Amino acid sequence: SAVEFKSRKESTFVLPGEDDEIYIVVTRGEKPTGGFTVDILHVIEQEDAIVTLYKFKDPADDELVTQAITYPFDLVKIDKTDKTIKFKKIEHENEHEEGFNIQL
């Protein structure tokens, strides 16, 4: 079944790819203008899980943006795994630079 990217809310999910690959997807849902972004920062393999670190960015108040409804998303392709895929939203720029001791 097809995935509906035009959702009005944020979501995270995994899609099957070709052969031995999968796609990790993070979406922001429907936004009223351009300038909203999604960035998958790191995909970290841990002993029992794959952790996906991502962040959202909103346009600055004075930023010139596209005046159109947008559906920001990001995706990465990784090798298929039986490990659980976990998602961690990074709220602050330096949060992921302190090392990869991620608390989930």
Task: Annotate each predicted stretch with a short phrase.
Residues 1-104:
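Exposed, flexible binding/inhibitory loops of compact, secreted disulfide-stabilized domains
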